[in-house]
Amino acid sequence: MHNGVLANSRKEERSGILNIADHLRPMGYRVGLTGKSHFRLGQQQFDGIDGFTGNANGDIAEYDLSGVRTYIRETQSAGSPFCVFICSVHAHHPWTVGDESHFPHEQLRIPPHYVDTPATRKAIAIHAAEVEEFDRQVGDVRAMLNESKLENDTILIVLSEQGIAMPRGKWSPYDHGSRAVCIAHWPGHFVPKKTSAIAMYSDFVPTFIDFAGGQSQVPLDGKSLKSLWLDERDKHRQSAFISNVHPFWQKAIVTEQYKLIWTGFPNEDHIHSNFASTKFFGKAWSEWKEASEKNRDVAAKIIRVLHPKRYELYDIQNDPYEVHDLAENGQYQNVKLGLLAELKQLMADAGESLEPKQPQGKEKERTRRRKKR
């Protein structure tokens, strides 16, 4: 799954946008939500359900499914179908939940684009511990559906967060920051399988409408996943458009085989301010920089983070960590140019400028610095 154009660096308030409740409530569905929520677009409100915290930056480890159970029971008593969003805050920072000892630091596999330091291993371990807590929540939800005799009548969809908050992860167009896990479960209907089909978060609204037997009231960017999940086809999209969400102009296109990344201002330091804070990756980033002073390979990794080339091309099938850039390899020029043309077309279709622009947040930050001088 790819975040795609769900959120980009432009913070414009879009009018006329319908949320999933706007689509499902007219079809008789009750639509509820517990836990984390960001968006406020649409006309219909979600029914609030107690049990899961909405504070992604807190230390609350406990959760309670009794509110969800009650909500589902009430909808059944009323003869209404339901759509419930259980929005976990795991594995969002501060990574204080879960048992780190389940992931011994010395046994961890370090991705090749990371610098192997004690703080790096610590960050991976505590993140994994919180992912394990998320997995436990998913198991509890499955058990609840089974106890309620609903598992065979309910589609359960599990989505991960978009990536670990480390360099070239969250807030970046690289796969560790734009690819998410999607698991769809419906016993007797979905054939167990793993697919490499490309999909985007925007595909879920038409998918829900399709399974509910309805029709969209307005044109939608997404495409229903119903026939893919029912094993009626094995492909979904040719490509996905990725627009970076942190304050650096980066656009990307990904296919099943390749990813092309276009960086608008490669001479600027591409390091999110959060990585300099102790809340996020500050200690590990300091260790990376210190190691780069004595190690040429580490220095090269730092440069790849801070100053990505204007164009990067990766064979993500054979290079999932995106460490072997093919953009300047003559054998791949046709691939590069073809993807760049397709990327520009997707940008135009999405109403994006084809000229790199400094995001407003970046411009304001520079203005503040100039005023201080």
What function would you assign to each model-found segment?
Residues 1-312, 320-348, 352-358, 363-373:
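Formylglycine-dependent sulfatase
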